[in-house]
Structures are given as structure tokens and as C-alpha cells.
């Protein structure tokens, strides 16, 4: 059994998911800052939420635009077809969701997806599909999460990389 766990490439993604999440966060910031640098622009600010309560992971500001960003990720080629988005993000100015498809082995970004409005606009409607908890209760039922919506991949715009993402974020 132990040998099987060591050979399963998904095991570290389960047992060290918070490490993976932080790595992806820092890799994304590095890519955005490097892309900004190549543009000759050095005016990006980054604020990280310490409490996961308001629907966003980070706040980015550049070009006078403030963005509350919820980050999502999945593996390239995975069967994931939707992500869960907090309705609290609707309350934030220029809220948006960035969904990254990453290489399972290297964590390299392979595809970027965007859901959000123009700079200065609020987050578009999240639809009415209420999310459910991923784990069932003692009776096996998966209760609803009334403050969250399932947002399908079809709602997201595919982007070509960090440069296109910066345009979506800040114009």
C-alpha cells in the first residue's frame, strides 16, 4: 500500500495541497510582475487576504484599477468542468476569477481562464447553480453552500498567458 501511495502522482497534491496552493500563488505573481516589467510598468501592488471570508484570495492594483481576485486551479486534462465561486466576490469592486490549468508534475501554467468584467466593473452574474459541499454529512447528503455558485468552464474566457491576463485585469 505504501509503495502504491509513493507512485501515485496525485498523492502530494492531496497531502500537500496548501503548499501547492502557495506555490501557484507565488508563481502567478511572479509571472504577472515579470510581464508588467517587460511592459516597462512597475506599478503593481499585491495584497494577500489572511482570512478566507470575503470571496477573494488576493487584491491587485495597477493603472488605478483595484481587483479582488479569486484564484482557482486544476490539472491540465482533468475532468474538472466547474469551480465554486463565493457570492461575496460580487460585493467587491472589479471582482474576478482566474482559473489556471497547471501541469500536474511541474505546476507550470498551461492555460489561463478569465471570468470578470472590464476594469472598474463589478463581477458578472454568477448564475443560480448553488454549490454543494464536496463531502457528505453523516447520512451521505451533500448540503448546499448557499453563498457559493458553481461556475462552468464555458463561462470563462481562455487567455494566451500573463500578458493577456494583465490586459483583462488592468486594461
Labelled PLM ranges:
Residues 1-54, 59-171:
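Mixed-charge (Asp/Glu-Lys/Arg
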Amino acid at each position: 500500500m505504501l509503495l502504491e501511495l509513493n507512485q501515485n502522482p496525485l498523492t502530494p497534491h492531496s497531502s500537500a495541497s496548501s503548499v501547492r496552493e502557495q506555490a501557484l500563488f507565488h508563481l502567478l505573481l511572479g509571472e504577472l510582475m515579470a510581464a508588467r516589467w517587460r511592459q516597462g510598468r512597475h506599478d503593481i501592488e499585491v495584497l494577500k487576504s489572511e482570512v478566507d471570508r470575503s470571496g477573494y484570495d488576493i487584491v491587485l492594483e495597477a493603472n488605478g484599477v483595484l481587483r479582488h481576485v479569486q484564484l482557482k486551479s486544476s490539472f491540465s486534462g482533468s475532468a474538472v468542468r466547474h469551480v465554486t465561486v463565493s457570492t461575496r466576490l460580487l460585493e467587491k469592486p472589479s471582482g474576478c476569477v482566474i482559473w489556471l490549468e497547471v501541469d500536474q508534475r511541474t505546476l507550470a501554467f498551461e492555460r489561463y481562464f478569465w471570468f470578470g468584467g472590464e476594469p472598474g466593473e463589478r463581477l458578472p452574474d454568477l448564475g443560480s447553480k448553488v454549490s454543494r459541499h464536496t463531502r457528505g454529512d453523516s447520512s451521505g447528503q451533500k448540503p448546499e453552500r448557499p453563498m457559493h455558485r458553481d461556475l462552468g468552464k464555458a463561462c470563462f474566457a481562455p487567455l494566451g498567458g500573463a500578458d493577456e491576463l494583465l490586459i483583462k485585469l488592468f486594461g
